[in-house]
Every structure is written in C-alpha cells, then in structure tokens.
Regions:
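Active-site segments that bind and position negatively charged phosphate/pyrophosphate groups
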Residues: 1-95, 101, 105
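C-terminal charged capping/lid subdomain of soluble metabolic enzymes
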Residues: 81-147
Length: 147
C-alpha cells in the first residue's frame, strides 16, 4: 500500500512540493502502522534492507539508506519475478539512483552486498537467501543495476 501511494502520484512526489511530501509522509506512516500491527519491521524490510545494511557495514562511504534500498528493491523484485521496471521507473522519476554507478559504489561491492546480505539478520530469510550466485548476478545485470 505504501509504495502504491507514492507510485500512483509520482509526479507530485517528484515536484518536491508540499502535496508530494504529504504523500510520502502518508506512505511512511502507513508502513509504520503495518510494522506496529505485525510487531516487527518485516512488512517493510526484506532483502533490500539486508543489502543496504551490508553496504553500511562494508563500504568506506555508503550511500543514503533509501537510495541503497531502492537499488536493492530493483534486484529483489526481479528475483521475485515481479514488475522491477516499475520500481526502476519510479526511482528514476524522482532522480534516485538506479544503478551502482549512480549510487557511487563499485559494481563488485554492490554484487558482494547482494551475495553476502544473508550474513545480516540471518533469522530473517529473504529472496536473497534463497537465490544462488548465478541468479543474483543475472538479476543485477538484467536490471542494469551493475554492468
């Protein structure tokens, strides 16, 4: 629901005006409510967050958390067989990074983050934990997150 709120009115969000900011805040509150109901951050935190936390722990200069999660969302959605292009296009519409170069982190480090993210919160199993190296490399290349 939270992502849909932003996606359906991405032009308003991209404008940076109050109406767009309100949409983002509404989406964040919605996400927070889902986490409160579940009693865990799981509804809003999957492989993309484990990817981001790995970068935070292993990069000399990590990027912004949301930007890292955005990149992680592209690859994890690809692995799920979902509409990763919609995520990429939504990020692009707000001038967010959509590949490792734009994120400012080398391809090798980004790929290592996807491959080694299972080290982060190992009790939280995500699509990255269930994917092998070949699948992850294919996803990162097919989505142009690396390459």
């Amino acid at each position: 629901m939270a992502a849909e709120l932003v996606e359906k009115d991405i032009a308003k969000v991209a404008s940076g005006k109050e109406e767009g900011v309100r949409l983002v805040v509404k989406a964040l509150i919605s996400s927070g409510v889902a986490m409160s109901i579940a009693g865990t951050s799981r509804p809003a935190s999957g492989g993309e967050h484990k990817f981001s936390h790995w970068l935070d722990s292993n990069c000399e200069t990590p990027a912004l958390h949301g930007e890292q999660c955005g990149l992680g969302s592209i690859v994890t959605m690809y692995l799920h067989g979902g509409n990763w292009e919609k995520i990429r296009d939504t990020l692009k519409a707000v001038n967010a990074p959509i590949n490792s170069s734009e994120l400012g982190i080398d391809d090798d480090i980004v790929l290592n983050a996807f491959l080694n993210s299972k080290e982060i919160r190992p009790q939280r199993v995500t699509i990255l934990d269930k994917s092998n190296q070949k699948q992850i490399e294919e996803a990162a290349l097919a989505t142009s997150v690396i390459g």
